[in-house]
UniProtKB/Swiss-Prot annotation:
Residues in coiled coil: none
Name of this protein: Lutropin subunit beta
UniProt subunit comment: Heterodimer of a common alpha chain and a unique beta chain which confers biological specificity to thyrotropin, lutropin, follitropin and gonadotropin.
Subcellular location as annotated: Secreted
Keywords: Disulfide bond, Glycoprotein, Hormone, Secreted, Signal
Disulfide bonds: C30-C78, C44-C93, C47-C131, C55-C109, C59-C111, C114-C121
Glycosylation sites: N34
Keyword Aminoacyl-tRNA synthetase: no
């Protein structure tokens, strides 16, 4: 009976790890996540912070241990599968300055190659994007 319990515990651990041998433990997988972003323009007096949905999380990857004649394979990143765009109006912009700031809103996410046309694939930053001007917070969600 004790051997059966050990096997059950081992199986549960493997299922919780996703069969990744420990690589995925305690790391949230790629999914839509709420994040606060900042929008500002050099011509407008106010920075606006707002909350939207972005793609974030862990994507499994492999790195070759031994050198190979082949180039390294692409590293997967958490990126948009489906998205829509929303916008906010920056307040106080002078006439002739476009006050509209548009941004992507994640509907679903997937692990895939980075597409710089609509993703920032640079990894985590030491400091988040911050306002350099007086700021106003908007609640969009």
């Amino acid at each position: 009976m004790e051997r059966y319990q050990e096997l059950t515990v081992l199986l549960l651990l493997l299922l919780l790890e996703g069969g990744s041998g420990g690589a995925g433990s305690f790391r949230p997988l790629c999914r839509p996540t709420n994040a606060t972003l900042a929008a500002e323009s050099d011509a407008c007096p106010v920075c606006v912070t707002f909350t939207t949905t972005i793609c974030a999380g862990y994507c499994p990857s492999m790195v070759r241990v031994l050198p190979a004649a082949l180039p390294p394979g692409p590293q997967l990143v958490c990126t948009y599968r489906e998205l829509t765009f929303s916008w906010i109006r920056l307040p106080g912009c002078p006439p002739g300055v476009d006050p509209i700031f548009s941004f992507p809103v994640a509907l679903s996410c997937a692990c895939g190659s980075c597409r710089l046309s609509h993703s920032d694939c640079g990894g985590p930053r030491a400091r988040p994007h911050l306002c350099t001007r007086p700021h106003l917070s908007l609640r969009l969600l």
